[in-house]
């Protein structure tokens, strides 16, 4: 008899060449996996018979279970006696989905996606909107990576006072990037003074006349803050070692049964909050050029960590056929893979269309992060006038 492992390696390609019994084992595995993903509960022989396999006796199903368990595709739940698919079974199930017709996407979802912009200069903000919508539909945390876009321009500055000698500055750009800094104020300032300085700098950035009359002290402080913020911004813009990462919806994990276990929740949150690891997964997904699932132990094998007990799916997005980054979702092991995969593809296609339209209309270009060796150089330091970043908005935004 052909072993279960050989049957599964071939998946659908092997169906026409194997015995009816071996094909039935494959059906049992996928039916068990699908039922587990739907309910999140261990699957018993009686439940499987009632749901998918009415032509088989419970004894026959248990025999198939035993064979699949011996091959490492199912594990027994000691409380209920039902079976749970292993990471290996889930991997074969996900690979199998590529051979199946994609699940239908409802009209309301298409309507929501159609409301996303068809072209835009505010690229990062629109990518955030798209991933927020994806997370809302799937009820899962979402994230995406992005390169730095050339010819961006600073459009606004906000200053929030923390106390009399500390303030948080927020810079926003035309392409939707946001940068924050906490700055030390050389002299104590009151709230009204900070607000006058903020309004003065907002007009200064936009080359607009200002009605704010600043004292000598406030004028000196405003330019001191401006110079500090601009230098920090240019440093970030010109020197970055990894793609920008944007994440949202972390609290959605709390809705899932698996994450009610404090240890599993801590591992999942730890992964989601680790920028380096998330960027690594997105980078792998981007270079694979297709939707890629990382399931359970696969994550620990790639990242060199303990098994986080969750799954991640990523998919690349493009601008004029050039890969820009990837977007993804994170959730429990029993993710709704059948629904999530086509939805991710749909969102990626929409983003591709928007970015390609924007590429031609706004002449967009971008830069990848560069890793550099920390060595002293005799070359002159990069001067700001040679940078493609602009401190003032382009004419189209004025």
Curated annotation (Swiss-Prot):
SUPFAM superfamilies: GAF domain-like, Winged helix' DNA-binding domain. GO terms for molecular function: DNA binding. GO terms for biological process: negative regulation of DNA-templated transcription. Pfam families: HrcA (PF01628). Gene3D superfamilies: 3.30.450.40, Winged helix-like DNA-binding domain superfamily/Winged helix DNA-binding domain. Keywords: Repressor, Stress response, Transcription, Transcription regulation. The keyword Nucleotide-binding does not apply. Coiled coil: none annotated. InterPro entries: GAF-like_dom_sf, HrcA, HrcA_C, WH-like_DNA-bd_sf, WH_DNA-bd_sf. Belongs to the HrcA family. Negative regulator of class I heat shock genes (grpE-dnaK-dnaJ and groELS operons). Prevents heat-shock induction of these operons. This is Heat-inducible transcription repressor HrcA.
């Amino acid at each position: 008899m052909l072993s279960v492992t050989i049957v599964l390696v071939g998946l659908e390609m092997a169906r026409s060449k194997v015995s009816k019994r071996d094909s039935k084992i494959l059906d049992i595995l996928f039916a068990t996996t699908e039922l587990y993903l739907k309910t999140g509960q261990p699957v018993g022989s009686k439940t499987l018979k009632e749901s998918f396999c009415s032509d088989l006796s419970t004894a026959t199903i248990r025999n198939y279970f035993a064979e699949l368990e011996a091959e490492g595709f199912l594990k027994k739940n000691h409380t209920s006696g039902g079976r749970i698919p292993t990471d290996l079974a889930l991997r074969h199930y996900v690979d199998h989905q590529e051979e199946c017709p994609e699940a239908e996407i409802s009209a309301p979802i298409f309507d929501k996606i159609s409301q996303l912009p068809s072209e835009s200069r505010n690229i990062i903000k629109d990518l955030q909107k798209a991933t927020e919508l994806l997370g809302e539909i799937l009820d899962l945390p979402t994230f995406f990576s992005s390169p730095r876009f050339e010819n961006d321009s600073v459009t606004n500055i906000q200053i929030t006072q923390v106390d009399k000698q500390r303030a948080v500055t927020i810079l926003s750009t035309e392409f939707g990037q946001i940068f924050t800094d906490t700055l030390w104020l050389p002299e104590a300032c009151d709230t009204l003074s900070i607000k006058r300085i903020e309004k003065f700098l907002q007009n200064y950035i936009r080359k607009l006349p200002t009605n704010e009359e600043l004292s000598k002290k406030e004028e000196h402080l405003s330019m001191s803050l401006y110079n500090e913020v601009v230098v920090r911004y240019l440093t970030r813009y010109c020197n970055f070692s990894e793609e920008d990462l944007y994440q949202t919806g972390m609290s959605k994990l709390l809705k899932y049964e698996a994450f009610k276990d404090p240890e599993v929740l801590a591992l999942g949150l730890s992964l989601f909050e680790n920028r380096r690891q998330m960027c690594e997964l997105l980078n792998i997904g981007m270079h694979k050029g297709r939707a890629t699932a990382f399931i359970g132990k696969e994550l620990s094998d790639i990242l060199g960590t303990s098994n986080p007990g969750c799954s991640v799916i990523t998919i690349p997005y493009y601008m004029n056929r050039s890969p820009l980054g990837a977007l993804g979702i994170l959730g429990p092991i029993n993710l709704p893979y059948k629904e999530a995969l086509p939805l991710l593809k749909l969102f990626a296609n929409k983003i591709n269309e928007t970015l390609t339209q924007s590429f031609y209309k706004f002449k967009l270009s971008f830069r990848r992060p560069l890793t550099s060796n920390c060595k002293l150089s005799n070359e002159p330091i990069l001067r700001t006038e040679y940078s493609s970043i602009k401190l003032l908005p382009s004419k189209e935004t004025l």
